[in-house]
Amino acid sequence: FKQAQHKRVGILTRLPLSSGLLTGKFTPQSIFAGDDHRAFNRRGEAFDRGETFSGLDFQTGLRIVEELRPLIPSGFSMTQMALRWILMFPAVTCAIPGAKRAEQVGENASAADLPPLSEATMQKIRELYEREVRPHVHQYW
């Protein structure tokens, strides 16, 4: 993000919900259709590994989501917190989440109008990211 800001380049974030992981709706028992990339590309078998769950192993992602749940501010959904988090970075000009239903579009869009996350929440998410996400994915970028 720092380099983009230095060069005055905006960042459009793709997959800010990590293929749905950050909606909080999946469980270890979740099953994806055979033609869903979350079923057939978990280890990058068909295309870039980072396209599925942002490069994380599904079980690792589920564990991280459970660690995030206590941080969700009152009045926010997990989805909204995840989107609000990425939009808190000054270099990010737009987040492009996917949606299958109209109500998901509304929930996604409303995240931009929610109050900023507290510095304490941002710090806890940052610590979780550095500890649990960065070691698994940054070598792919």
Feature map (PLM): residue ranges:
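Extended hydrophobic/aromatic segments used for targeting, binding, or gating
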Residues: 111-141
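Structured helix-beta-strand junction loops
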Residues: 6-8, 75, 128
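Conserved short secondary-structure transition element at the edge of the structured enzyme core
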Residues: 13-17, 45, 51-113
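Glycine-rich, positively charged active-site loop/lid region within alpha/beta enzyme cores that binds
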Residues: 2-71, 135-140
